[in-house]
């Protein structure tokens, strides 16, 4: 984590911008006393919604609460979906989305914070089948069923890289790994961080396949409306959270 901290510190120093005199989203958040956070609630360990209680939990939920505390405001979670995330940000349904993969298409719509996690797409499969699906060539064969949640970077990766395999779109990302465990699909290609977590939830049943050597490079960051003042605050807060140990403590809670 120290190497990541140094990288974030350097990037923060290069990107900090002064707050605008008036009319910034940061000012609006402080004036309304509420930070609105967009979250899908279906991406453990980053965000998960308990449908019984209506409560959210996860690493990015804890980080969002820490950000709201730093701002001196309360927090309101705005439910969204992966397919509706960009529209929600563009239309102002929320101020910031937590735990989002950095892409250039998303950069066109809003600002990203300094990245806080290196990631990448890698397979997860039943442990008995893990040797079958080591490479994209192994996976991209007729008859192989690759399950994906709709509208996010997982489905986009599959459709860009797989041409012979059968891509099965499943709408509920909270139960999608149960579909995999029960044999309704052969594998899923998702973020390495998620494969590690799901393998721990399904010991001996699901196995993360080479999560330390994913198929591509990706980073997680916080995605916000394009306001320089808000970005400067978020980057400064993240920098301090990494340096004072708050980030590491929350990361250990959810990932170790």
Predicted regions and their residues:
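Extended ligand-binding regions for polar small-molecule ligands
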Residues: 61-70, 128-129, 137-143, 152, ...
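Bacterial N-terminal signal peptides
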Residues: 5-15
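Ligand-binding clefts/hinges and TM-proximal coupling segments of bilobed small-molecule sensing domains
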Residues: 22-24, 153-170, 207-211, 238-256
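Periplasmic-binding protein-like
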Residues: 106, 118-125, 192, 196-239, ...
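Short helix-initiation/N-cap motifs at beta->coil->alpha
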Residues: 61, 77-87, 168-182, 216-218
């Amino acid at each position: 984590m120290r190497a990541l901290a140094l990288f974030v510190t350097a990037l923060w120093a290069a990107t900090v911008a002064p707050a605008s005199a008036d009319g910034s989203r940061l000012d609006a958040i402080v004036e309304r006393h509420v930070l609105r956070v967009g979250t899908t609630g279906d991406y453990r360990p980053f965000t998960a919604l308990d449908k019984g209680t209506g409560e959210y939990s996860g690493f990015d939920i804890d980080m969002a609460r820490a950000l709201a505390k730093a701002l001196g405001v309360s927090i309101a979670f705005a439910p969204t979906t992966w397919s509706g995330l960009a529209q929600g940000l563009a239309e102002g349904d929320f101020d910031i989305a937590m735990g989002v993969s950095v892409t250039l298409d998303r950069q066109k719509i809003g600002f990203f914070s300094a990245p806080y996690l290196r990631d990448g797409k890698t397979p997860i499969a039943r442990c008995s089948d893990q040797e079958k699906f080591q490479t994209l060539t192994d996976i991209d064969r007729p008859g192989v069923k690759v399950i994906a949640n709709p509208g996010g970077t997982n489905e986009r990766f599959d459709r860009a890289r797989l041409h012979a395999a059968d891509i099965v779109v499943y709408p509920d990302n909270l139960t999608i790994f149960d579909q995999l465990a029960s044999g309704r699909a052969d594998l899923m290609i998702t973020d390495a961080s998620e494969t590690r977590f799901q393998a721990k939830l399904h010991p001996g049943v699901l196995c993360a396949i080479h999560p330390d050597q994913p198929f591509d490079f990706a980073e997680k960051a916080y995605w916000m409306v394009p306001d320089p003042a808000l970005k400067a605050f978020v980057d400064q807060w993240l920098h301090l959270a990494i340096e004072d140990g708050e980030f590491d403590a929350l990361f250990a809670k959810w990932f170790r």
